[in-house]
Amino acid sequence: MSDFQKEKVEEQEQQQQQIIKIRITLTSTKVKQLENVSSNIVKNAEQHNLVKKGPVRLPTKVLKISTRKTPNGEGSKTWETYEMRIHKRYIDLEAPVQIVKRITQITIEPGVDVEVVVASN
């Protein structure tokens, strides 16, 4: 191998060993599925002996819509209220790149949105 190739390989190894900070944000309207996904991520992090914080429970957003029950406007003026609750959790991890890739490749239940943000060092 030439010197250039050796330097490139060494640089790639250093990047893989470099510890990065990531924040995984989970969002869902279904609490059980959200808790299952967050517990799976935490278990994987504990198996790899990673520095973790969380899952941190963020305040639940409640979206409400009020509508009239009767479509034609006649009759008594009765109203119907609908609401949707949005639950959020986040988990902070510190780990090398390869281990983070393994942890984030878990199966995610339908209805759970996952956002992964990598902090710059």
From Swiss-Prot:
GO cellular component, one term: cytosolic small ribosomal subunit
Record localization: Cytoplasm
Covalent link (Glycyl lysine isopeptide (Lys-Gly) (interchain with G-Cter in ubiquitin)) residue numbers: K6, K8, K21, K32, K101
Record bears the keyword Ribosomal protein: yes
Modified residues (N-acetylserine): S2
Post-translational modifications reported in the UniProt record: Ubiquitinated at Lys-6 and Lys-8 by HEL2, to activate the ribosome quality control (RQC) pathway in response to stalled ribosomes. N-terminally acetylated by acetyltransferase NatA. Also partially acetylated by NatC.
Keyword line: Acetylation, Cytoplasm, Isopeptide bond, Ribonucleoprotein, Ribosomal protein, Ubl conjugation
One of the GO BP terms on file: maturation of SSU-rRNA from tricistronic rRNA transcript (SSU-rRNA, 5.8S rRNA, LSU-rRNA)
Annotated GO MF terms: mRNA binding; structural constituent of ribosome
InterPro entries found in the cross-reference section: Ribosomal_uS10, Ribosomal_uS10_CS, Ribosomal_uS10_dom, Ribosomal_uS10_dom_sf, Ribosomal_uS10_euk/arc
Quaternary structure and partners: Component of the small ribosomal subunit (SSU). Mature yeast ribosomes consist of a small (40S) and a large (60S) subunit. The 40S small subunit contains 1 molecule of ribosomal RNA (18S rRNA) and 33 different proteins (encoded by 57 genes). The large 60S subunit contains 3 rRNA molecules (25S, 5.8S and 5S rRNA) and 46 different proteins (encoded by 81 genes).
Family that this chain belongs to: Belongs to the universal ribosomal protein uS10 family.
Function: Component of the ribosome, a large ribonucleoprotein complex responsible for the synthesis of proteins in the cell. The small ribosomal subunit (SSU) binds messenger RNAs (mRNAs) and translates the encoded message by selecting cognate aminoacyl-transfer RNA (tRNA) molecules. The large subunit (LSU) contains the ribosomal catalytic site termed the peptidyl transferase center (PTC), which catalyzes the formation of peptide bonds, thereby polymerizing the amino acids delivered by tRNAs into a polypeptide chain.
NCBIfam families: uS10_euk_arch
Record protein name field: Small ribosomal subunit protein uS10
Lineage, uppermost ranks: Eukaryota, Fungi, Dikarya, Ascomycota, Saccharomycotina
